[in-house]
Structure formats: C-alpha cells, structure tokens
C-alpha cells in the first residue's frame, strides 16, 4: 500500500480524499494556488505545495507544476478528484512516465471515454443503448446550424471533452444553435483545453440516471446501483438521490449490466460512472462515462456501505476487489443537496465573498438516520470567483425516501451560512415540492416548476400562523431585553405590552401573548392559541422553537420593528407593532425603489468577455448585448425589450461587481 499520496485538486473533494487516506494510514500532500493558501484542504493535509496564481489554467491544471510538486514531496500516487486533471490522459501518461501511480483508470480508458464521440462509438459496439446524433467534428457555427437542422431540433450541443454541465447548450432553432456552438466552444477551451464540439438529438422530458461501476482491471467489474440526478439547472446537478424512485429491478439490472460491459470494453480499472438519460417508458440511452469519482458519490456510499475512495486507492495499488456483485447492498435511501454560492432570487447568479458565518448541522451516523456534510470551506474563509461555486454537499440517509427527505429538510433548516448568497432556500423549497415528494420529475423540473426563476415560497395559512406566533414570542423577549438596557432607573423600565400585530406575507395577525417561565401562549383574533417554547436570545441568527409541540427552526435577522425570517424557501419580513403603530403604519405611503428599467446591470461579479452592441444601435427583445464570465461559466445578457443603446460603460476584459451599470438605454 502507498505511504504518501498527492491530491491534485482542491476544495471539498480534496478534503474527502484526505479523510479516507488518513483512515488508511496514508500521508497526504495538498496543492494550492494563491487564492487557496488558507483553504481547508491545505490545513488538513500533512504537506502542502504552492503551485501558482489563482486561475486554474495557471495552477491546478498545469501538469508540469503538479509533477514538480510530486517530485518535491516524494508522493507515490496521485488522486485527481473530479474536474481539473481528473480526466486528462496526458496527466495519466506523465504520471506513468514518472513511475507514480494514478488513482484512476488507465490512460486508454480515459482517452476513449473522455472523447464523447469515440465513447459513443465504443458504447454502440458494446451493445449499449445510445442517442442518435452527429459524431463528426464541427468546424464552425454555420456547420453546427446545418447539422442541427439535419438531426432535427431540439439538439444538445456538447463539448467532446466536457463534463459538469460546462460546454453544453440546448438549441431549439438556428440562432440558438449558432450562439450555443460558440459559447460551448469557448467554455470547452477555457475549462478543458479542448474546443471540439459534437451535436446529438435532445431527448425531451428525460430523467438523468447514472450507474456507479467499480473494476479492478483483473476481471472483476461490478455496479453499485444507480443514482437519480434529474434535478438539474443548466445541466448542472443540484439534488441527487440513491436509489432512483423510478427504476424497477429489471431496468436497474439491464442498465447495470450494460455499464459493466462498457467498462470491460475499455479495460477499465477504478471507480467510474456511466450516465444515461431515461424516458417515461424506461427506455435508457447512453450519455457519457465519467472516468473519475463523481461529485455525488456519497449517496452511493450511504446505501451500499462501500467507501469508493478507498476502493480506488486499493485498485491503484494493485489489489483485487474484495466485493462481488452479490455483496452489493441497497440499504435505505440517501439524498444529496449541493449547496452553491449563488443567489436563487437573482437567477442563481454566482456569489463571492467571505463566509462570515458557516455552521453546518451536526454530522450523524446512527441507527435509522444519518447526516453527512462534505465540504472544503470554513467560517471566515473566502468563496473565490476562480473556481466552482459549490460550498458543500449535504447528505442524509434514512430507511425510506420520505424519511430521507424529512431528514434533509431538518438539516437544511439547521444549516447557517452568512456573508454570501446561497441556494439553501431553493433546496428547501424543492424538498417540499409535491412533484419531488412523489418522485415525478425530469431534467426539466426546475425550468418547468420555476419558469420565472425562484421567487421564494408562498407559505400556507397554518404555517404563517406558526411563524407569527413564534415571531411575536421572540419579539417579546427582545423588547424585554431592550427595556433592561434602556438607561432608565431600576423598577422604572418601559412596560412591555401583551397585544401585538404581526404582519407576514402581506397578512396581518393581531395576537395577544401570555408568558410564563417556560414559554408563551400566543392567542389569535379568532381565539386559536399556539404554545411557543424556545431558549432563543436576541442576536442569535437561528431560532429553534417548539410550537404546539412541533419543532420549528427559523433563520432570523433582527430589525427595528421585527425580524427577517427565512423558512423552507420563504424569505419573509415579520413586522411586529403595537395595534396603534400598525394602524398608523397602514396609512404611510410605500417608498418606491430606484428606476433601473433603462439600464443593463451586471447580475453577478464577473469578467466581460465581449460586448455585442455599440452606442446608438437599436436592439430587439432577446438580442445578445454582452457576455459575462463567472465561476467558469459564460452568461449571455440579453435585451429585455426593444430599445436604443445610449451609453456603454464597460468593455471586454473589465471586471465588474453586482449591479454595476454595463450600458444605458434611451
């Protein structure tokens, strides 16, 4: 067994590999860029080597720099994680030439499966079901349009060396094919150093289901069930689960056997994932094979009990698999929510900055339930614009799907993140969505259920009453505290009344509070009463309460007349006033926000890649105005309506912040 391995990656996956290596008694080496000098993976590793500036193409994906770090530290093997160099055959070749083990598949398998065109041909030869499309190389946008017309819209434009949702676009017409080809080509070049593009038919309303395979390259190949990955945004997975609520035993076995056949056809050795799209009739089609550890591997580990990182290390060290197909369990149900640094209320645009508060829920592994949080960040750390915006992977396990979802709800409620935008409200909303709960979902779930983007959740009346009762009880505690530090003489404090009006989601709830040493009873106008118990104190960002014996966890920010309350995807202003104050407030005119209707604002921190218009140009609704790159993704900003460009304030190469004015219109 290896004595020392280097992890050629960063963030949560580097931390994940370090944990298993430590368990196996193997020393670890981290690599880091300038931006990651204080990163968690650097702190966790036994050694760390600096490899360059923040951009990945000047540090993490520069093979020579990684090889220098290997030589400097004497590492015997390298785990590539996912992304970066994990599926780069030249890296595997460089390691082989150096006599260093690659904790992954052979170079030939990476090469064959890393090229989407070649992999599809191999899959067809191995009798794996495939999607129709054009597998040749495409030279320019006009050829892409012609091929798209021949295949028939809609089509998927994909980077041959792509993955992780990058270098992929769906096109429904010639214009989208033309623009999608160029954006995919640019993203592919910057993310993978390979700008080859291919086009295939886009299967509408599919599910995305993948099979985890494991092979030792010595005649033993097994599959470890499937993962359902249909909850996606821009082809980037958001929520995964294992097993799938859709598959039956016959389809599961057929997909597993075809996946193993494909692995054997390319001489595979290590952990790998074969991705399929599955239609409503359970017909499945090969999508791609990822020759690396997947981001979502924890859900497989939770239902099988197999440590996939350990298996990868053992196979790389020449060991045979210690488990056979008959040993593979499917125990219970696991969920994974990807926590991203992005603002769901602003079209999921990337968010960067410092984590002023980072308190994940406690990790649990006990009979009947489990909570796991794979992360690479810490409180006080920075979320950088240079890398993927994932903060953490929050996983739960329970005996069945409904229980696993409930565990996830509670875990998301308990997760505290401040300082940056994050998608916890959206994840919480999905967990409560009827379609998700029923398992009735496709890869179009997010765009169909949130066609105008995520605007928060509208809570029902019983939930609003629970939050109103809790808010009133917390406000009473805050008011009592304020009277005690008012500067008045003892025994002359301002009296805290019992009657309040709580305004939530546009509704007013007149309530009366009767307090006792153990809590408070909030009585509504109609006579209904709710008992609230909590040890919450003013200033605490999370309130863990009991309302009529049922738990309620709220994220709270104190204000002058109440709280900002966040709960299960709802972001509410809870204003709490005396009846007289509420009466007067109702007569006050609303303050209108500034008019930005004639401006194009930068929706995220990022870099202007190109500006498509000039001053004085008349633009049409939907016309591309400029492209902003952030978190390795290109975002085309379009005109919301017809108009004339009056002034352009930014040029290609400019770095902008959120709400910077890019251009103004007449």
Which residues does each PLM region occupy?
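N-terminal beta-alpha lobe that positions the nucleotide/phosphoryl donor
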Residues: 1-274, 278-297
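Short amphipathic alpha-helical segments
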Residues: 3, 166, 243, 388-394, ...
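Short flexible coil/turn linkers enriched for glycine and charged/polar residues
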Residues: 149-153, 162-164, 193-194, 205-207, ...
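Catalytic cores of soluble metabolic enzymes centered on carboxylation/carboxyl-transfer
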Residues: 259, 298-530, 658, 664
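Conserved nucleotide-binding/hydrolysis modules and their immediate coupling elements
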Residues: 307, 515-519, 525-542, 546-553, ...
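Catalytic P-loop NTP-binding/switch module of NTPases
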Residues: 551, 557-602
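Structured functional modules or segments
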Residues: 591-666
């Amino acid at each position: 067994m290896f004595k020392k391995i280097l992890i050629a990656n960063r963030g949560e996956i580097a931390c994940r590999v370090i944990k298993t290596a430590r368990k196996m008694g193997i020393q670890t080496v981290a690599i880091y860029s300038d931006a990651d000098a204080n990163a968690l993976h650097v702190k966790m590793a036994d050694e760390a080597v600096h490899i360059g500036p923040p951009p990945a193409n000047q540090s993490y994906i520069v093979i020579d720099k990684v090889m220098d770090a290997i030589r400097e530290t004497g590492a015997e093997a390298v785990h590539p994680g996912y992304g970066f160099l994990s599926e780069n055959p030249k890296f595997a070749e460089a390691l082989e030439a150096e006599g260093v083990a690659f904790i992954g598949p052979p170079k030939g398998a990476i090469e064959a499966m890393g090229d989407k065109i070649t992999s599809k041909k191999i899959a067809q030869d191995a009798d794996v079901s495939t999607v129709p499309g054009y597998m040749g190389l495409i030279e320019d946008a006009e050829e892409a349009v012609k091929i798209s017309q021949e295949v028939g819209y809609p089509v998927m434009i994909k980077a041959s060396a792509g993955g992780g949702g990058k270098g992929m676009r769906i096109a429904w017409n010639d214009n989208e094919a033309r623009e999608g080809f160029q954006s995919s080509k640019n993203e592919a070049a910057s993310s993978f150093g390979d700008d080859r593009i291919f086009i295939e038919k886009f299967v509408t309303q599919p599910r995305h289901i993948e099979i985890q395979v494991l092979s030792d390259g010595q005649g033993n190949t097994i599959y470890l069930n499937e993962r359902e990955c249909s909850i996606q945004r821009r082809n980037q997975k958001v929520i995964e689960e294992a097993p799938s609520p859709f598959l039956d035993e016959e389809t599961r076995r057929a997909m597993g056997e075809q996946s193993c056949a494909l692995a054997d056809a390319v001489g595979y050795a290590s952990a790998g994932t074969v991705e399929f799209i599955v239609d409503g009739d359970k017909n499945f089609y090969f999508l791609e094979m990822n020759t690396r550890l997947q981001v979502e591997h924890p859900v497989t580990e939770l239902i099988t009990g197999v440590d996939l990182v350990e298996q990868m290390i053992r196979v790389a060290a020449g060991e045979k698999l210690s488990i056979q197909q008959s040993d593979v369990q499917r125990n219970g149900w696991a969920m994974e929510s990807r926590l991203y640094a992005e603002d769901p209320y602003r079209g999921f645009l990337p968010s960067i900055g410092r984590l002023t508060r980072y308190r994940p829920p406690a990790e649990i592994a006990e009979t009947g339930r489990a909570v796991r949080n794979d992360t690479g960040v810490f409180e006080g750390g920075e979320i950088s614009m240079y890398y993927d915006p994932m903060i953490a992977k929050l996983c739960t396990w329970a005996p069945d799907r409904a229980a696993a979802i409930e565990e996830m709800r509670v875990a998301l409620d308990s997760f505290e993140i401040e300082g940056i935008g994050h998608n916890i409200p959206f994840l919480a909303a999905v967990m409560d969505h009827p379609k998700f709960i029923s398992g009735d979902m496709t890869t179009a779930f997010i765009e169909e259920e949130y066609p105008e983007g995520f605007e928060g959740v509208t809570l029902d009346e019983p939930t609003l009453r629970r939050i109103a009762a809790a808010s009133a009880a917390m406000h009473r505690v805050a008011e009592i505290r304020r009277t005690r530090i008012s500067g008045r003489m003892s025994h002359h404090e301002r009296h805290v009344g019992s009657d309040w009006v709580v305004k939530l989601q546009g509704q007013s709830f007149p309530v009366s509070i009767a307090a006792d040493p153990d809590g408070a009873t909030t009585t509504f106008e109609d006579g209904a009463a709710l008992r609230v118990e909590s040890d919450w104190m003013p200033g605490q960002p999370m309130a863990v309460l009991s309302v009529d014996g049922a738990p309620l966890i709220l994220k709270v920010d104190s204000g002058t007349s109440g709280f900002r309350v966040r709960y299960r995807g709802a972001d509410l202003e809870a204003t709490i006033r005396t009846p007289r104050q509420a009466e007067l407030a109702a007569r006050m005119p609303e303050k209108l926000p500034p008019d930005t209707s004639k401006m194009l604002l930068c929706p995220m921190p990022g870099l202007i890649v190109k500006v498509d218009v000039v001053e004085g140009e008349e633009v049409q609704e939907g016309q591309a105005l400029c492209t902003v790159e952030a978190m390795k993704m290109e975002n085309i900003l379009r005109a919301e309506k017809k108009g004339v460009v009056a002034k352009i304030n930014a040029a290609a190469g400019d770095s902008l912040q959120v709400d910077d004015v890019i251009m103004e219109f007449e």
